[in-house]
Amino acid sequence: MLDHESVRRLRACAQALADGTREDSAETVVRRVFAIQAQDATAADLGIRVRGRDITARAIRIAYEDERSIVRGWYMRGTLHTIPSDDARWVLRLLSPRILAATSRRYQQLGLDDDLRQRADHLIRRALAAHGPLTRAELTERLTTLGIPPDGQAPFYLIRHAALTGVLCHGPQRAGEATYVLLDDWLPSTGRFRWEGDSALTEVARRYLAAHAPATLEDFAAWSGLPVTWARRAWKLLAESGVITEYGGLTMLAGRVEELPGPSDTPDVRMLPAYDNYLIGYRTREMSVPALHQARVWPGGGLIRPTVIADGLAIATWSRGSGARSIKVRAFGPVPPQIQREVDMEKDAVVRFLRPTT
């Protein structure tokens, strides 16, 4: 049986958030955690920063746009995530049918029938082939030729549909704004999927456990958006292959518990962005955020506030202040001097990342 502190430290270490664990590049961060939640582009960049060693915003842009080693798209739960580029196609093939099925009622409400969605896919493909990269506004303007009103949510759902069907993905930023490109142009296909069927299901479950364990199959289902029956099958296949071990109702990759280092004299303080994987990668919250303070992290309305953790335990929320170099930290209680020093250092690091001097 693992106690709460051991579970928390193992999870934080898996996420490169404790015991001094940090990666050296944006690509290795994303490979380690498999997916960074990315509906907010700045929060996604901060999610890479907090797991890295001196990674700059410029280095992250290079990984996205020059190296093309990471890519942003609609994956887990149909939400924007950043994942390794060479995983984009097989993950999309596994997840997109469920996402499209779950969106069918919304398509009906917006009057987007199968024929119209297919015509929109073709129009978007032609537009990007001839004129890409294009912004959402530029694609929306072209969709009006199909009778799609430019206001409302229909353009977004059609652009997202084109992503889920493998037409497009996010491309380079233009003046800080996202653009879209043809997936096959931006990330040329190798001609085959790395994993398919059950092998894809077990691989995405294994990646989840590598980045989140100790966890349950219900945690995996909540994170991925896949049915619990699928998660149960993934667990069964992983168990049959000897990949996982059970510890009192929690699952680990075999051998991972032995990797937990002893406690450090210096607290490892990290400033997580809004919507960070460490906070939302599980069905329940009590391991990382004390119950008394959960409403401060999850205030309602779908918001998840930026949070300060020390050795994996939430101790405060934070926000950007009115000044260009201002960070406000709101602690849940008295902060020991040793932890406060680490908080101050982390604040300075976030400011440097957001407002580089050169």
Predicted regions located by residue number:
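Phosphate-backbone binding and catalysis cores of DNA-processing enzymes
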Residues: 1-137, 141-151, 291
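Internal, well-folded beta-alpha domain core
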Residues: 123-155, 204-248
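A short, conserved structural fragment
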Residues: 65-75, 79, 164-173, 239-247, ...
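Loop-centered beta-sheet repeat module
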Residues: 152-233
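Short, cationic-aromatic polyanion-contact patches
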Residues: 83-88, 174-194, 250-263
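Glycine-rich, small/acidic residue-mixed loop/short-helix segments
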Residues: 291, 296-358
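Non-catalytic regulatory appendages
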Residues: 237, 241-292
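Short, amphipathic alpha-helical interaction segments positioned at domain boundaries
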Residues: 93-103, 185-206, 268-270, 278
